[in-house]
UniProtKB/Swiss-Prot annotation:
Residues 1-21 form the signal peptide. InterPro entries: Kunitz_BPTI_sf (IPR036880). A motif (Cell attachment site) lies at residues 35-37. It comes from the Eukaryota. Its main location: cytoplasm. Keywords: Cell adhesion impairing toxin, Cytoplasmic vesicle, Disulfide bond, Hemostasis impairing toxin, Platelet aggregation inhibiting toxin, Secreted, Signal, Toxin. GO terms for molecular function: serine-type endopeptidase inhibitor activity; toxin activity. Expressed in salivary glands. The keyword Signal applies. It is found in: Cytoplasmic vesicle, Secretory vesicle; Secreted. It comes from Ornithodoros kalahariensis. One of its GO terms (cellular component) is transport vesicle. Tick salivary platelet aggregation inhibitor that plays an important part in the anti-hemostatic strategy of ticks. Inhibits platelet aggregation induced by ADP (IC(50)=130 nM), collagen, the thrombin receptor-activating peptide, and epinephrine, although platelets are activated and their shape changed. Binding to platelets is similar for resting and activated platelets (Kd=50-70 nM). Acts by specifically binding to platelet membrane glycoprotein IIb-IIIa (ITGA2B/ITGB3) in a divalent metal ion dependent manner. This is Savignygrin (-).
């Protein structure tokens, strides 16, 4: 009985730690800009390949993607990275 309680507590703690560090917007595709003369909005994005924040843009007509941050500080705060 006591072993079951310890296993349950360990699993609960593991799930809590995993959920706390999860930032879904950081897992979205990075911003890669627009083609031609389309209206673009510039900002910051988290690049999973490099593991850091970089400048990027998105086409305004498609709406704001989830992996968009107004500043480098906002990006680093949400996703970490260099």
């Amino acid at each position: 009985m006591q072993a079951n309680i310890f296993v349950f507590a360990f699993l609960l703690l593991s799930v809590a730690v995993a959920a706390y560090g999860y930032q879904p917007e950081c897992l979205e595709p990075s911003l890669y800009g627009c083609r031609g003369d389309e209206d673009a909005t510039f900002g910051w994005t988290f690049d999973r390949e490099d593991g850091g924040c970089r400048q990027g843009s998105y086409c305004t007509r498609f709406g704001q993607p989830k992996n968009y941050f107004r500043s480098e500080g906002d990006c680093k705060k949400a996703c970490g990275g260099a």
